[in-house]
């Protein structure tokens, strides 16, 4: 029997707010354990939560970006369960009345554009963190307790593991473009649970699903879903029954393992939090946030093609990340040459970022200085070959390209007399190749150009070298 995969994702996006969701403690990642805490984080008696306004605005922002309906009235609820890193014994979340509902995310997993529907986006707080790798003890770090999250819940519209990965990457791109999260999966800023089931092809009823947790990369999302598909298929083909459960992905072993039986909503005994008033969003707030939304990747790529006359492929690559697109546009503003700027950003800049494991925000060469380097090529001050040397020196020193060119004496030689002297010396030193060229082996022109450029240490104007060579070779 042939089966169809059905996947829905629950994505937890950690917001990059300065303070936590319901108190004034810092939400910054990486601090010493249990230092970013207060009576609210620790659930001490009498401590009352106060909702961070920025969390509401970020939720509305993401809702508008994904075409959701924004609820004018939504409610914060208590999700009750026991876990050592949840000191209150409940998590503040939303249930029956989320702030955003019925949205859409567009993906392309290689088979054309697909629309993945969203059930809801809701506000919740993160739990603390259990640490198991210090001796035989388990420790609790509550720095993360109360850090604001948005949970993005999709309909089960995904049909392959690649679509699931593409969807998660798209969500990450959206939240990064909006500036509400860094989307760092390694640090837990973006986490994903996958609800996976199989059903016979042609059936409309869903099969029993399992929830997969602990997937900390796009590749692991694909691998975990693929593994679970095969596990389900083997059980079904053997006449077995799929258990509704939560399973953990073990990346080292390449397999999932049972964690617990999958809970239903009623297991959490949701009810409105009596310590928090309803969340009210008026039309004025919606209109203001809508007016502040950035230009999104697809729109920006179309504009790049129209405005800068660069290929659609270049535009798509340059707009994957907002910061890279900004960097490109600033370099074009200075260089005046969009295609050259595109080539340099996609080539040399991205090479360095990849080799050094850096983000564009950490790149040492400012976009206006890259633009200045490209402008020097356009003005004939330096050749492209010399420009690459200058680029490496800029990486080390951070100096402006014009300063480096002057200091290192790298300006291009355009003195026709000096070039003619070198060309004549090369021709005199290679009589055999000269005779062969004049005998019809015109491909030897490249040999003579190379010799001349080598003699002048790459600083000769290539166009002038070609012109002088051709005149003398044909003479």
From Swiss-Prot:
Name of the protein in question: Aspartyl/glutamyl-tRNA(Asn/Gln) amidotransferase subunit B
GO molecular function per UniProt: asparaginyl-tRNA synthase (glutamine-hydrolyzing) activity; ATP binding; glutaminyl-tRNA synthase (glutamine-hydrolyzing) activity
Gene: gatB
UniProt catalytic activity: L-glutamyl-tRNA(Gln) + L-glutamine + ATP + H2O = L-glutaminyl-tRNA(Gln) + L-glutamate + ADP + phosphate + H(+); L-aspartyl-tRNA(Asn) + L-glutamine + ATP + H2O = L-asparaginyl-tRNA(Asn) + L-glutamate + ADP + phosphate + 2 H(+)
Top EC class, one word: ligase
One Pfam family this sequence matches: GatB_N
SMART domains for the chain: GatB_Yqey
Entries under Gene3D superfamilies matching the protein: 1.10.10.410, GatB domain, N-terminal subdomain (1.10.150.380)
Highest taxon of source: Bacteria
Assembly and oligomerization: Heterotrimer of A, B and C subunits.
Enzyme Commission number(s) of this protein: 6.3.5.-
Function: Allows the formation of correctly charged Asn-tRNA(Asn) or Gln-tRNA(Gln) through the transamidation of misacylated Asp-tRNA(Asn) or Glu-tRNA(Gln) in organisms which lack either or both of asparaginyl-tRNA or glutaminyl-tRNA synthetases. The reaction takes place in the presence of glutamine and ATP through an activated phospho-Asp-tRNA(Asn) or phospho-Glu-tRNA(Gln).
Organism: Pelodictyon phaeoclathratiforme (strain DSM 5477 / BU-1)
Annotated keywords: ATP-binding, Ligase, Nucleotide-binding, Protein biosynthesis
UniProt GO BP: glutaminyl-tRNAGln biosynthesis via transamidation; translation
Family: Belongs to the GatB/GatE family. GatB subfamily.
Keyword Manganese: no
Lineage: Bacteria, Pseudomonadati, Chlorobiota, Chlorobiia, Chlorobiales
């Amino acid at each position: 029997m042939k089966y169809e995969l059905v996947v829905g994702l629950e994505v937890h996006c950690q917001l990059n707010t300065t303070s936590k969701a319901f108190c004034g403690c810092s939400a910054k990642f990486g601090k010493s354990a249990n230092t970013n805490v207060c009576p609210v984080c620790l659930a001490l008696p009498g401590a009352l939560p106060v909702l961070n306004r920025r969390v509401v605005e970020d939720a509305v922002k993401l809702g508008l970006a994904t075409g959701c309906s924004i609820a004018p009235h939504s409610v914060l609820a208590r999700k009750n369960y026991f876990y050592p890193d949840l000191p209150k014994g409940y998590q503040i979340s939303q249930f029956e009345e989320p702030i955003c509902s019925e949205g859409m995310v567009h993906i392309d997993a290689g088979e054309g554009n697909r629309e993945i529907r969203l059930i809801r986006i809701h506000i919740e707080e993160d739990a603390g963190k259990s640490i198991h790798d210090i001796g035989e003890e388990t420790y609790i770090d509550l720095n993360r307790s109360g850090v604001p999250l948005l949970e993005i819940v999709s309909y089960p519209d995904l049909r392959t593991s690649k679509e699931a990965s593409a969807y998660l990457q798209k969500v990450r791109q959206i939240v990064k473009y909006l500036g509400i999260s860094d989307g760092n999966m390694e640090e837990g800023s973006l986490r994903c649970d996958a609800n996976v089931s199989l059903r016979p092809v042609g059936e409309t009823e869903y099969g029993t699903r399992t929830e997969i947790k602990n997937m900390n990369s796009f590749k692991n999302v694909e691998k975990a879903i693929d593994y679970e598909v095969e596990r389900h298929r083997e059980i079904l083909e053997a006449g077995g029954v799929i258990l509704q459960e939560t399973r953990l992905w073990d990346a080292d072993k390449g397999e999932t393992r049972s964690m617990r039986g999958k809970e239903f909503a009623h297991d959490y005994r949701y009810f409105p939090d009596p310590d928090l008033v309803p969340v009210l969003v008026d039309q004025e707030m919606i209109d203001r946030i809508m007016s502040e939304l950035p230009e999104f990747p697809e729109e920006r790529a179309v504009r790049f093609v129209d405005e800068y006359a660069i290929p659609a492929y270049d535009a798509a690559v340059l707009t994957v990340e907002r910061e890279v697109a900004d960097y490109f546009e600033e370099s074009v503003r200075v260089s005046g040459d969009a295609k050259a700027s595109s080539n340099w950003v996609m080539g040399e800049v991205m090479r360095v970022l990849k080799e050094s494991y850096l983000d564009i925000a950490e790149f040492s060469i400012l976009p206006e200085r890259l633009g200045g380097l490209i402008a020097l090529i356009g003005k004939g001050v330096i050749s492209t070959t010399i420009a690459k040397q200058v680029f490496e020196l800029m990486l080390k020193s951070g100096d402006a390209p014009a300063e480096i060119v002057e200091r290192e004496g790298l300006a291009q030689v355009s003195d026709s007399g000096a070039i003619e002297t070198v060309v004549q010396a090369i021709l005199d030193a290679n009589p055999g190749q000269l005779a062969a060229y004049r005998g019809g082996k015109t491909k030897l022109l490249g040999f003579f150009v190379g010799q001349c450029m080598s003699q002048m240490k790459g600083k000769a104007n290539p166009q002038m070298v070609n012109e002088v060579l051709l005149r003398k070779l044909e003479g």
